[in-house]
Amino acid sequence: MTGPERGSNRTRPPYVVVSADAHAAPDDLDQFLDYVDPAHREAVAAFGDLSSVAIPMFGGVDPGRSDDPDAVRAVAARRLAGMGVDTEAARDWLARYSTEWVFASDADGKRLAALEDQGIHAEVTFPGPVLSGGLSPAMYLGGHTTTGLEVVWPALNAYNRWLADFCAAAPGRRAGVLPLDLHDMDRAVEEIAWARGAGIFGGIMLPAMSVRGGLPGYADEYYEPLWSACEEYGMVVNLHTGASGTATDARQLYDEKHGGFLGLYEVFVFTRRPLWFMILGGVFDRHPRLKVAVTENGVQWLPSLVRDMESFFDTHGGAPVRSYLRQRPGDYVAEHVVLGGSLMKRYEAEMREEVGVDRLMWGADYPHLEGAAPVHRLVLRHVFGGLPEEDLRRILGLNAVELFGFDLAQLEEVATRVGPTVSDLATGVELDDIPETFSWSLARPVPLVSSAASAT
């Protein structure tokens, strides 16, 4: 057991760690269909392999759609091979990764135990495909499809009800995030009210504006009922890279050779895009209690965005905006925007004062391949080791606790049992001291300038 440590004249309890970025889904198609209204079950099941709605960066394949774990691992192994990783070794690693360390759902309690083993006490749970065979049409149907609208709400409704059960299996430890379709605003508002009553408290996942036609930008008054419902029920508006942002013309512009890199590069911009529509559209003036979390999008971009918006606000055509906004763009960011820093790098942690210690949240991206399992505790030491204790308390847990409404006392009990302690993060570890696992290799920091470029 990990008890509280004694410091100079005071007790120093372990850190509370909330992963602001996690993903969960039903284990297979049959489990998912059990949650679909029988009147729509056949239509949802017949929607096919979802290849028409898969993000192009996956080459038209949704690795989370298959109910065959071997097929899922084969897709992931091919992706690793494209990054120069030995395919056979990748298959061996993925077989172990998806049976020992990561779990799509938690039918047998293994997921909760795996997270505690990694020093994680609670999670903000987004939908998404996961490597252990999980199925999550909700990730795509909420905003990525241009066809099959008749199955969108039955599929989303099914996922959301599964999510309520998933969260209820670990009370107070999982803040589920609600995917929505915004073409039917009345139904979206009803779903928010239902979700809050069902114990889903992680907020909503906002689709990017660009992925489906027929809807205005997020500055438009069309979304007023949505913002009002989020305020009323205390639901955070979440923008998650990949799950809530990609390009409408991706299929036309991306090809097999270039699509993977282009998709990964551009998806970050499309995920942030709703934020400046909301700021410049006066959404936060009309809804002062609204909070937006941008997750798995890095953290270094936010100070630059604020500087750019402030500059334009004062100069290039900013007069019309100044005439109706009550505050400056930077003020809205300071009051309403937080960042889910999935697998932050050390240099990002060292930017914490520039970005804002009170708006940074650590995310482990469990159970995705680019997450830190099973070396999460070492990664924490590398990223945060030796930094001020009070800053780490906020970034690792307190900011997420306050934003989403976790019970701090409950999580402190878990932290006392499993750590990490203050001593654990008092000193860091070098990058080379972290085992070179296939999963961690995808998230390891790289030089900002390549060796080839620096040699020229």
Feature annotation, model-predicted:
Residues 29-32, 135-138, 249-252, 304-308, ...:
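Short aromatic-enriched loop/helix-cap "lid" or pocket-rim segments at secondary-structure transitions
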Residues 151-152, 167-175, 180, 186, ...:
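Catalytic pocket-lining loop regions of alpha/beta-barrel enzymes
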Residues 126-132, 241-247, 366-368:
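Short glycine-enriched loops at secondary-structure junctions
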Residues 146-166:
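Active-site-proximal gating segment of KS-fold condensing enzymes and close homologs
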Residues 17, 92-100, 113-140, 173-180, ...:
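Divalent metal-dependent hydrolysis catalytic cores, especially in the metallo-beta-lactamase
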Residues 2-16, 30-86, 90-117, 121-122, ...:
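Mid-to-C-terminal alpha-helical segments outside catalytic/metal-binding sites
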Residues 22-23, 365-366:
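Active-site metal-binding loops of divalent metal-dependent hydrolases
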Residues 139-147, 254-264, 376-381:
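Short glycine/proline- and charge-enriched loop/turn segments
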